[in-house]
Amino acid sequence: MDAQQEKDEKKIIKISVRNLVEFILREGDIDNRHGRTASPEAMWEGSRIHKRIQKSKGANYHAEVPLKIELSEGDYTLAIEGRADGIEITCDGERQLDFSNNFNHLTVEEDMHVTIDEIKGIYMNLDALDEPVGVHRAQAMCYAYIYALQHDLAEISVQLTYCNLDTIELTKTAFLGNLKYFRETFSFAELAEWFTRLTVSYTHLRAHETRRH
């Protein structure tokens, strides 16, 4: 049996990046843990906040970037996909970049640096947030791994951008000054090792749940 035949015979699981990390980390929603639920109004406000922050970025920032990967793990073929809130590509030196017309076909050159931006609106005083929420960080790391793999990057950064949804009606200047950022840079090797552990854990748990039923 060749590799393609073996892959075809495996059970295909289609899963979003968000559902993947939530299945493994099993953390409650941050608003639920602080007495607020993800109501339709909150989801609508969260969508507004995403667009507002994204529009404040320059030409080096590309919003709502679809990413997907398919891989074999154990008895399964995982088809993992999601949408990065934003990808920002900056360049060393004075060279100006504008990817507005060719982002999807971009070749990332050696003097460019890529940052995956994950935007989260929460009902919480940002001063009380000392570190990014685990599932949010894991989402960004998944996107970073997929993008780095597909663009042959040695390193890539992730940024978690948090906004308190209670401040959404502030003026643009005050609003953009009321954001909190957490930023990390990873080597591709670090992300590859982490992502492998994530997918192995997922398939093991899925197999265990299947046997139970």
Language model features with spans:
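Short, structured interface segments
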Residues: 188-202
